[in-house]
C-alpha cells in the first residue's frame, strides 16, 4: 500500500536500490549538483511534472546549481512507498 508508513526495516531494504539517498529526520534526502542554474531548474521542472502525475510533491531547495530534495509523506508523518517511487523517478531523470 502506497500510503502506509514504512518501518525502519522496510526503509533500509528499499534504500538498497537508492544508495545515494540518505534517511534523515524521517525523510529521504539527496543533494544534486549541476553546472549552472538553468540545468538545476530544468531538472526541477521535470520533477514537477512527475510529481503532479503522482499527486506527491517534494520539499526542495535550489541555490544556483544545487538542488536538495527531501521526500516524506506529510499526511503520514514519514516515509511511504510514494516517497520511494518518487525518489526512483528522480534518479531516472538525473541520469537519463
Curated annotation (Swiss-Prot):
Single biological process term from Gene Ontology: tetrahydrobiopterin biosynthetic process
Catalytic activities: (4aS,6R)-4a-hydroxy-L-erythro-5,6,7,8-tetrahydrobiopterin = (6R)-L-erythro-6,7-dihydrobiopterin + H2O
Keywords attached to this entry: Lyase
Protein name in the entry: Putative pterin-4-alpha-carbinolamine dehydratase
Keyword match Lyase: yes
The EC number(s) this enzyme carries: 4.2.1.96
Entries under PANTHER family matching the protein: PTERIN-4-ALPHA-CARBINOLAMINE DEHYDRATASE
GO molecular function: 4-alpha-hydroxytetrahydrobiopterin dehydratase activity
Amino acid at each position: 500500500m502506497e500510503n502506509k508508513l514504512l518501518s525502519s526495516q522496510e526503509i533500509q531494504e528499499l534504500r538498497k536500490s537508492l544508495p545515494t539517498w540518505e534517511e534523515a529526520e524521517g525523510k529521504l534526502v539527496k543533494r544534486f549538483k549541476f553546472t549552472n542554474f538553468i540545468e538545476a531548474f530544468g531538472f526541477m521542472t521535470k520533477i514537477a511534472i512527475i510529481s503532479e502525475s503522482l499527486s506527491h510533491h517534494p520539499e526542495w531547495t535550489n541555490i544556483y546549481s544545487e538542488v536538495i530534495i527531501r521526500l516524506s509523506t506529510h499526511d503520514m508523518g514519514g516515509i511511504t512507498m510514494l516517497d520511494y517511487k518518487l525518489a526512483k523517478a528522480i534518479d531516472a531523470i538525473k541520469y537519463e
